[in-house]
Amino acid sequence: MSEPRFVHLRVHSDYSMIDGLAKTAPLVKKAAALGMPALAITDFTNLCGLVKFYGAGHGAGIKPIVGADFNVQCDLLGDELTHLTVLAANNTGYQNLTLLISKAYQRGYGAAGPIIDRDWLIELNEGLILLSGGRMGDVGRSLLRGNSALVDECVAFYEEHFPDRYFLELIRTGRPDEESYLHAAVELAEARGLPVVATNDVRFIDSSDFDAHEIRVAIHDGFTLDDPKRPRNYSPQQYMRSEEEMCELFADIPEALANTVEIAKRCNVTVRLGEYFLPQFPTGDMSTEDYLVKRAKEGLEERLAFLFPDEEERLKRRPEYDERLETELQVINQMGFPGYFLIVMEFIQWSKDNGVPVGPGRGSGAGSLVAYALKITDLDPLEFDLLFERFLNPERVSMPDFDVDFCMEKRDQVIEHVADMYGRDAVSQIITFGTMAAKAVIRDVGRVLGHPYGFVDRISKLIPPDPGMTLAKAFEAEPQLPEIYEADEEVKALIDMARKLEGVTRNAGKHAGGVVIAPTKITDFAPLYCDEEGKHPVTQFDKSDVEYAGLVKFDFLGLRTLTIINWALEMINKRRAKNGEPPLDIAAIPLDDKKSFDMLQRSETTAVFQLESRGMKDLIKRLQPDCFEDMIALVALFRPGPLQSGMVDNFIDRKHGREEISYPDVQWQHESLKPVLEPTYGIILYQEQVMQIAQVLSGYTLGGADMLRRAMGKKKPEEMAKQRSVFAEGAEKNGINAELAMKIFDLVEKFAGYGFNKSHSAAYALVSYQTLWLKAHYPAEFMAAVMTADMDNTEKVVGLVDECWRMGLKILPPDINSGLYHFHVNDDGEIVYGIGAIKGVGEGPIEAIIEARNKGGYFRELFDLCARTDTKKLNRRVLEKLIMSGAFDRLGPHRAALMNSLGDALKAADQHAKAEAIGQADMFGVLAEEPEQIEQSYASCQPWPEQVVLDGERETLGLYLTGHPINQYLKEIERYVGGVRLKDMHPTERGKVITAAGLVVAARVMVTKRGNRIGICTLDDRSGRLEVMLFTDALDKYQQLLEKDRILIVSGQVSFDDFSGGLKMTAREVMDIDEAREKYARGLAISLTDRQIDDQLLNRLRQSLEPHRSGTIPVHLYYQRADARARLRFGATWRVSPSDRLLNDLRGLIGSEQVELEFD
């Protein structure tokens, strides 16, 4: 093989994020195809792709050279930034490169990105080779300016600190000043004896990728492609040229080519991958192994005392627990993981001791008795048949992985504790990368290409919003996409470009829960990435790479439900303390509570963790779970596999005796499998059951059975053939019929694909049960906590308030004196609306109000509040929202007066603040002392009509709280529905039609699998709710009426809704209130007294009626005197349409009691 003549030493992948188009693997593949012996990837101030690059390089027979490009500043050039490429020659250089990168991020950075000081290179110079940065380096810029003194100073610095390790970089990519710089650099090299090196400053693989790269950069920089201000820093020649092309390009400077090979030979970094390094856990004089044994045995004693309070039963059950504990401890210590368990034990115990709610466990870790004994998990694995080998398999060495759920509010406290315990430089969170996803890349590319918003939006909306959606999947899922792609050249060009950019790394963020703890500094294993302020460090390797690099990942996950449970318990225990009751321990509640299961069987699971979706409620209704094992099964059953395979139907039918229970099949079953499959009525539902079947029938160890389970999941033919043979051989040894064994193997293989991790299912079922129990026993506190968690989502709060009303809970409006930021429960068991849930207010103003209230007591009235609160934080707009929401109802006569007095109150508060500033407290009499003075201080005005009050609540709270728009129609609606309210509805007999009325609170149109359209709306008359279905004919006729907040009168047949357990109506006729009046009203009655009538009133009456003439309803004027009453009927030309506007105008003119519709 001939000696290589060139190696690429400056290449950006997409991990540079500011530029670079290709992923590391394709870059390596291209280099291999070009016959290159080595390749350097030098992303901008990061090694994010290093682990993937290192693995791909060695896999392709290419030496990976570790390096990075930097922005550099030095005093000689002032604020001007220059470029420098740094390569690691050896492991010391790799360490110094890691420190340089980390330091650049930790100092903070601006729009130009992280920057290093050139002086940092003095201390960290060992093992590093520098490429000068070409025309953009400090020497390059000085040469182009002809500043020989500056050139000399720069060169002297590198000669002193990097002798034989500093190369003048030569680039020929057709960009401005490259040739001028190159000639000057060659002259300098000859004059000073400096080596030169050729690079192609690669940004993409092929020259055809240039346009895509330009768009990628424009997306990052926020320009359109045609913008004359857009920087044009790249050329089509920055692709991965072949050795031949580079040799031809630099034929006049052969030493620049030869030096690339020499540098590649000098760069020999070994990155240790695939080993694990844990921090040392403090164990005193004991070994880590012995300390784990000690703590586990002590913990088991406590657990057994709780599980079996009766000593005799405890003695009877102890042997199986002791044996299991011994087995697990042996495996953990043999595999070298005692420290891992102790570390997790410590931060979980610290959390519990410091009021941070922790989940009962999740994932396969719940199968470990050692974890249960150490209080890492809270489920007894023996009681629920959870297997340790599903978590840690001695026959397949891999790190244990506890996913630990913490309360969202306090999770960061735990991470802070870990940082304090092991050292801040030894603890870090993990990076995650955002990529250009299908929907977003269409929008980004469309914007950069200058297409109108509507054009791009139309294409983007055709891409389904499903997680993991790609353009390829979208073309399969949405028929319109290929159609417009073929029909429109502009669409085709946009999508073709989007395909080139899809999946390209766009930005970096923080992994949701991953934390690594190093035995030394994090930077001994991975460089750090920080935010712009130099805070919140994360490793530059993602979660899989950072583990491969030797750091052990701990998952600190935030679970919102734990926060809800915590908030609920705080309110509950506050109440219990007042009543002299001990605090409630949620971990100690019974798992067989009848009240909870009764509520579950009624599908009343709104706000219950994991059980609140429509589909889940349907499953609950069918299954009728009556024990905790059924709840574990619910979590496992509600997945696409079991739902689509018919497994769910079999499970339900077997539970309710409609199908014979067999183990596992009527034709092919074995009695020895009954203990394994009995909890799931003979259905193979869990992965653990797959393992137990292999153990029972064929004598597998549980470790071997876990390998079988994995093989069945991967479905590799050669592996399955091997396992089939092992299974048959084991069954034969156990005396089991060969045909039966193989038939059961086939059944197990079929269901293994649907099997769910029971440990995870059981752990999450426990959290579900805890929320169910709280809802059943402490409904107000639980719902207040749930609404607090959803305060930022008004739509969800509205739905939860509906649920509260359905449950019979009372919700009070927000109150500025008794209210809190969160929803809470008062001493009367009523939920007080959270002030923080008022739209348009924000946390700052509320904090200012509560601070003033805590300092000076309750506010007496509006003027007092404005005077005592910082009006810089509490501006007029915020105060208006608070008034409209009802939060100030106790501060004044009514909302209209409060609103009209707001200007005076703010003015008085301003005067009060000025007076206080010069020591003249209350000089202007702002703070009235007497109630009479307070009343007089408010503007005199009429209260708002109820509808205005309700509209204000709707605007600020998202719902009507103190009233209902239907209230003003109730008397009238009784005429249309025969006095029947929605709460009194019942199923109608076949063929019989009933009429109902209510406010539309939800409306939608859906398309069935057969393509039929169905309209669904929910009516509310404040007594109850009714779901109304409009099938095709009715929908075609009445769809325009299906609008939220409209009053509808609907006639149809009522039946039970199997899904909700409530009632539903199939509509035949739908009317709005105006149409109902036209149909049913016989006249509009206006009653006047002799004292009211004068020419002015009659004139205004005519003006009110005039716009509504040409209707169908006659107008009747009733004239009332002390001694007589007369009726005057207006002529036919004065028939009117009795709209809300007309009725409200007349009632405002004459009086609400004097205007009525007349009916037969």
Swiss-Prot record:
Alphabetical list of InterPro entries matching this protein: DNA_pol3_alpha_NTPase_dom, DNA_pol3_alpha_thumb_dom, DNA_pol3_finger, DNA_pol_IIIA_C, DnaE2/DnaE/PolC, DNAPol_HHH, NA-bd_OB-fold, NA-bd_OB_tRNA
Enzyme class: transferase
Subcellular location(s) of the protein: Cytoplasm
EC numbers: 2.7.7.7
A GO CC term attached to the entry: DNA polymerase III complex
Keywords annotated in UniProt: Cytoplasm, DNA replication, DNA-binding, DNA-directed DNA polymerase, Nucleotidyltransferase, Transferase
Catalytic activity field: DNA(n) + a 2'-deoxyribonucleoside 5'-triphosphate = DNA(n+1) + diphosphate
GO function terms (MF aspect): DNA binding; DNA-directed DNA polymerase activity
SUPFAM superfamilies: PHP domain-like
Keyword Transferase: yes
UniProt similarity note: Belongs to the DNA polymerase type-C family. DnaE subfamily.
Subunit-structure text: The DNA polymerase III holoenzyme complex contains at least 10 different subunits organized into 3 functionally essential subassemblies: the Pol III core, the beta sliding clamp processivity factor and the clamp-loading complex. The Pol III core (subunits alpha, epsilon and theta) contains the polymerase and the 3'-5' exonuclease proofreading activities. The polymerase is tethered to the template via the dimeric beta sliding clamp processivity factor.
Name the record gives this protein: DNA polymerase III subunit alpha
